[in-house]
């Protein structure tokens, strides 16, 4: 892999009922194949998607729809059939040409960071570095770009409410009289 080639990033975020976003985990690798080789420890993008689906049960995977990502969609569909696992919901998102990548990232993330709505682990070094060096001269913006896509489509859970003390709880459906 060339030193300056882009990274593939798969990121998992959680959203609380009060719309705080927590970065749970991410994979950031250069020259990652679309699908790993069975029997070897090297996983591909689609393998990581199945792994994250099992671990985090995301409601949606957002995949940047570019010429380079077309094989991901084809492989994901065939792997779903092969594994008989259709638990992965995904959205193909075109980057758009209305604004630059840097402006798009800033539009999505800047306000949320400024009000303290996005929370990272101290051990997420690559993401911390990309956030603190964000700008026209930064070497890589792949992790922060993945975070922007995740945040753009992340919504708080719908079935949540607050009790009298202000604690969040999951609302339970009430039984109805059908007679």
How should these model regions be labeled?
Residues 84-105:
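Conserved phosphate-binding/catalytic loops in two-lobed NTP-binding clefts
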Residues 40-42, 97-99, 110:
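A short linear-motif detector with a strong N-terminal bias
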Residues 101-115, 133-137:
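Short, surface-exposed amphipathic charged segments that create phosphate/polyanion-binding patches used
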Residues 98-100, 108, 166-172:
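General helical secondary-structure elements
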Residues 1-91, 117-179:
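RNase H-like, metal-dependent nuclease domains and their acidic two-metal-ion catalytic environment used
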